[in-house]
């Protein structure tokens, strides 16, 4: 029981290296929207 608590307490430190990635993640859907627009511009908005 105590071991599990210690493990959960250490998890945020373990994931600290992913902080920059988490900062970027919300932008990805916007990139897909921009990609869709560029694709439509490339095919001439058929």
Swiss-Prot record:
Cited InterPro entries: PSII_PsbK, PSII_PsbK_sf
GO CC annotation: photosystem II reaction center; plasma membrane-derived thylakoid membrane
UniProt keywords, alphabetically: Membrane, Photosynthesis, Photosystem II, Reaction center, Thylakoid, Transmembrane, Transmembrane helix
Membrane protein topology class: Single-pass membrane protein
Pfam families attached to this UniProt entry: PsbK (PF02533)
Main subcellular location: membrane
Cytoplasmic side: 40-46
Propeptide boundaries: 1-9
Ranges facing Lumenal side: 10-19
Cofactor-binding details, from the entry: PSII binds multiple chlorophylls, carotenoids and specific lipids.
Tagged with keyword Zinc: no
Transmembrane annotation, as ranges: 20-39
Family to which the UniProt record says this protein belongs: Belongs to the PsbK family.
Binding partners and assembly: PSII is composed of 1 copy each of membrane proteins PsbA, PsbB, PsbC, PsbD, PsbE, PsbF, PsbH, PsbI, PsbJ, PsbK, PsbL, PsbM, PsbT, PsbX, PsbY, PsbZ, Psb30/Ycf12, peripheral proteins PsbO, CyanoQ(PsbQ), PsbU, PsbV and a large number of cofactors. It forms dimeric complexes. Part of a photosystem II (PSII) assembly intermediate complex PSII-I; crystallized from a strain deleted of psbJ, it forms monomeric PSII before addition of the oxygen evolving complex. PSII-I includes 3 assembly factors not found in mature PSII (Psb27, Psb28 and Psb34).
Alphabetical list of PANTHER family matching this protein: PHOTOSYSTEM II REACTION CENTER PROTEIN K, PTHR35325
Protein name: Photosystem II reaction center protein K
Upper lineage: Bacteria, Bacillati, Cyanobacteriota, Cyanophyceae, Acaryochloridales
């Amino acid at each position: 029981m105590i071991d599990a608590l210690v493990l959960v307490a250490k998890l945020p430190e373990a994931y600290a290296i992913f902080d920059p990635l988490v900062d970027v993640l919300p932008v990805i859907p916007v990139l897909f929207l921009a990609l869709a627009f560029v694709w439509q511009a490339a095919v001439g908005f058929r």
